[in-house]
Amino acid sequence: MAGIISSMTVPDLLKAGWRERIALLAETLQTWPWLDTLKTLRQRFREDRLGLTASSLTFTTTIALVPLATVTLAIFSAFPMFGQFQGALEKYFIQSLVPDGIAKPVLGALTQFAGKAHRLGTVGLVVLVLTALALMLTIDRTLNAIWRVRKPRPIAQRVLVYWAAATLGPLLLGVSLTLTSYAISASRGVVGAMPGSLSVLLNALEFGLLAAAMAGLFHYVPNTEVRWRHALAGGLFVSAGFELAKKGLAWYLAQVPTYSTIYGAFATVPIFLIWLYLGWVIVLLGAVIAAYAPSLSMHIVRQPNTPGYRFQAAVQLLRELAAARARGERGLGLVGLASTLRTDPLQIEPSLERLVELDWVGRLDEAGEKRYVLLCDPNTTPAQPLLAALLLDPSPGLRGFWQRARFGEMTLQELI
């Protein structure tokens, strides 16, 4: 999925006809490293402990569901003209996001709890809002960790983005779903039954809405540059994963009624927790797809983080940037550097950021991809700060070794 999106640029799609598009798609499917993609997903799931992260997000989501529902209901209550959008949103929740067996009980409980929120005082409402924001900040921290971002956005900017998503998101989704319901009603009024083509179109619309929402999450939340085609690849993975998980869980509950037998009427709670966990696992794997799409499209497998790898990457980056300056080039992008070094962009980014912190490399934040330029003179710049930061800490016990190895006298030119 990521290869299809990431290897087909917008100009290619506009210039190519339908036959060329199909041929390009078939070629991408044949050459895409599917096995490497599965290996990357498995490796990142294990090394980044995404299962534990999904459990944490499940717990936080359970606590924050009522506050989020309260905010949504408050928006619709403040504007009576949007009342019909609320009904469309509830219908979408039942039909699309949650398996049939638990959708109505969960929605009824959320609506009931959120409806009682007006009885709370000012302090209680503030706590509800802070709980909702805690979930959003947890998501922010998790996605930045997947993209290996060490410095998140400023707290005010993060709160503003998530608050806009929590308030405007349900409203825009409700408008879209209401227009969809109007189309269904009009179609039934004309032909008496919904045509199969219209049913497929509406299902595709629901699929696309979720994919677009996830793509927006992957594009805007990480404090790094994420191309839209990579974010959309992750969004499509999440949307497809939700459909498969929903049908699979519904089939399992129908065939193996273990929870209903043991828990009875209380079975909705453990089933819903399982669904939340599966949902977060799918979202996190979609984020991995979006984050590693650049390296996968270059047929590059992430190398193991052996001791000294970041130092090695920093030396290679300095060598490439020095060569680019000698050729008269105006800097290199992260993807270009990774392609030249045949390595994962996310794997060399920490070393590149360390060079920026040392003021040896400058980052140009212009339109398009960020570019990096070499600022220092390798012939006169001492290598000691880089050696101390990424290779060997000059502690008192190693001072003699540093002197014998002449680390303090070494320049960058001797390294590169």
Curated annotation (Swiss-Prot):
<dbReference type="InterPro" id="IPR017039">
    <property type="entry name" value="Virul_fac_BrkB"/>
</dbReference>
<keyword id="KW-0472">Membrane</keyword>
<dbReference type="InterPro" id="IPR023679">
    <property type="entry name" value="UPF0761_bac"/>
</dbReference>
<protein>
    <recommendedName>
        <fullName>UPF0761 membrane protein Mpe_A1422</fullName>
    </recommendedName>
</protein>
<dbReference type="Pfam" id="PF03631">
    <property type="entry name" value="Virul_fac_BrkB"/>
</dbReference>
<dbReference type="GO" id="GO:0005886">
    <property type="term" value="C:plasma membrane"/>
</dbReference>
<feature type="transmembrane region" description="Helical">
    <location>
        <begin position="159"/>
        <end position="179"/>
    </location>
</feature>
<feature type="transmembrane region" description="Helical">
    <location>
        <begin position="120"/>
        <end position="140"/>
    </location>
</feature>
<keyword id="KW-1003">Cell membrane</keyword>
<feature type="transmembrane region" description="Helical">
    <location>
        <begin position="271"/>
        <end position="291"/>
    </location>
</feature>
<keyword id="KW-0812">Transmembrane</keyword>
<keyword id="KW-1133">Transmembrane helix</keyword>
<feature type="transmembrane region" description="Helical">
    <location>
        <begin position="198"/>
        <end position="218"/>
    </location>
</feature>
<comment type="similarity">
    <text>Belongs to the UPF0761 family.</text>
</comment>
<feature type="transmembrane region" description="Helical">
    <location>
        <begin position="63"/>
        <end position="83"/>
    </location>
</feature>
<feature type="transmembrane region" description="Helical">
    <location>
        <begin position="234"/>
        <end position="256"/>
    </location>
</feature>
<keyword id="KW-0997">Cell inner membrane</keyword>
